[in-house]
Amino acid sequence: MAKKNASLLVKLVSTATKTTKTGEEKLTGYFCVKKRNPKNLPKKLEFRKYDPVVRRHVLFKEEKLK
């Protein structure tokens, strides 16, 4: 039998905020999905990636994939 893959799918969510017409700030809601092996990377992932909603490179933080 083949070994079970140890990689987990995690969701990286943009931390950028966007101001709405009413003046309140909300997250852009943009995210991407990556694989992470918890044996090799025990800490949560953080990347600076491009967010097309705000058209800038911003910090993306790991969240659980639902």
Curated annotation (Swiss-Prot):
Superkingdom per UniProt: Bacteria
Residues that span the membrane, as ranges: none
Gene3D superfamilies hit by this protein: Ribosomal protein L33
Pfam families to which the protein is assigned, alphabetical: Ribosomal_L33
One CC-aspect GO term: cytoplasm
Keyword check for Cell membrane: no
GO biological process: one example: translation
PANTHER family: 54S RIBOSOMAL PROTEIN L39, MITOCHONDRIAL (PTHR15238), LARGE RIBOSOMAL SUBUNIT PROTEIN BL33M (PTHR15238:SF1)
Family to which the UniProt record says this protein belongs: Belongs to the bacterial ribosomal protein bL33 family.
Name assigned to this protein: Large ribosomal subunit protein bL33
